[in-house]
Amino acid sequence: MLKGIHPALSPELLKTLAEMGHGDEIVLADAHFPAHSLHKNVIRADGISIDILLEAITPLFEFDAYVDAPLLMMKAVEGDSLDPNVETRYLNAIESAVGFTPNLTSLERFDFYTRAKQAYAVVVSGEIAKYGNIIIKKGVTPIL
């Protein structure tokens, strides 16, 4: 155990976050997401909701400042509905952890899947909210 590291972060997830470079993306996927059929680098975070993962990850993670929206979520399929509180819950978790909320946009379902295939890794969470997936784009970490 490391001091100052959120207990929701597994050693595998910490290693992955450290390996990622600027411009790399990571998918925080809900429990329904077809992670293993879309990606070879899948990390399990069973039982942990995405808002908790966001609270744990974002203090360690610089958001990409060179894109309009470093956060991407999945749009509901036409005729289906999604709970707007999911997005609010995620943005509140980020705000709570880092003091601001980066821009967020949404992608159609299959565009989201295509983008997820290109990500550095997919983290399968215990999130059960429908359309509860989010992609985070890593930025350049400032040198202090």
UniProtKB/Swiss-Prot annotation:
Keywords: Carbohydrate metabolism, Cytoplasm, Fucose metabolism, Isomerase. GO terms for biological process: fucosylation; L-fucose metabolic process. The keyword Isomerase applies. The active site is at H22. GO terms for molecular function: fucose binding; L-fucose mutarotase activity. GO terms for cellular component: cytoplasm. Its main location: cytoplasm. Homodecamer. This is L-fucose mutarotase. The lineage of its organism: Bacteria, Pseudomonadati, Pseudomonadota, Gammaproteobacteria, Pasteurellales.
